């Protein structure tokens, strides 16, 4: 499944109530920050952290409380990075709305980006609701444990004051651009594994040297 991050829309955290409701339907030009999350799960071959967390492009959905698409856009050259390619911001032009969910998909396949998954902008353009996105299945270009240096990521925007709430209010910005009080947190959809093979001299042997040379290897049930 493409959208594997859990939903929290069934219940509202009390902290969310502190966010004042906004007048809906007003023009909104808002800055949305993103920061790729470092995954603790390790089930595939490792790459340098520079590549593990790099965001090359970003497709952003905003879903209204009914799960319908309120806004969508594919960001490529118009991403503002902050220090490195794992964090930055994008400018969103939409209309004000309460209790939306903002979802991102990073590193879609383009002429310059290849993550090993055959997911393109056209696939995202066919999405009409949050349930469509949740049902979308990513397909790998090839079945291998080797990984490229570009990785598919998905994630929600979470409230900056309540890291468990993915419900966001988008304010109108008649007086000028504003920053949303939330952060997109894309995470890799794959994982990595590290196999550590150690050899030790048996305690009951008097070996002076030990040479271990595997002739091959195979990974199953990853």
Enumerate the language-model features and the residues they cover:
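Bacterial N-terminal signal peptides
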Residues: 1-6
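Sec-type signal peptide cleavage vicinity
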Residues: 7-222
């Amino acid at each position: 499944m493409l959208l594997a991050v859990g939903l929290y829309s069934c219940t509202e955290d009390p902290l969310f109530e502190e966010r004042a409701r906004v007048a809906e339907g007003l023009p909104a030009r808002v800055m949305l920050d993103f920061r790729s999350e470092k995954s603790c799960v390790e089930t595939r071959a490792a790459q340098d952290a520079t590549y593990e967390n790099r965001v090359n492009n970003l497709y952003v959905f905003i879903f209204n409380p009914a799960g319908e698409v309120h806004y969508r856009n594919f960001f490529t050259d118009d991403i503002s990075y902050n220090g490195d390619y794992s964090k930055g911001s994008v400018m969103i032009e939409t209309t004000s709305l309460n209790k939306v969910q903002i979802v991102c998909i990073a590193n879609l396949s383009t002429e310059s980006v290849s993550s090993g998954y055959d997911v393109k902008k056209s696939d995202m353009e066919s999405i009409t609701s949050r349930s469509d996105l949740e049902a979308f299945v990513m397909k790998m270009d090839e079945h291998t444990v080797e990984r490229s240096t570009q990785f598919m990521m998905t994630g929600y925007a979470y409230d900056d004051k309540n890291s468990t709430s993915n419900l966001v209010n988008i304010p109108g910005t008649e007086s000028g651009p504003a920053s949303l009080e939330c952060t997109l947190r894309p995470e890799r959809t794959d994982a990595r594994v590290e196999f550590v093979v150690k050899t030790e001299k048996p305690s009951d042997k008097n070996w002076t040297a030990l040479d271990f040379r595997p002739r091959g290897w195979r990974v199953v049930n990853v």
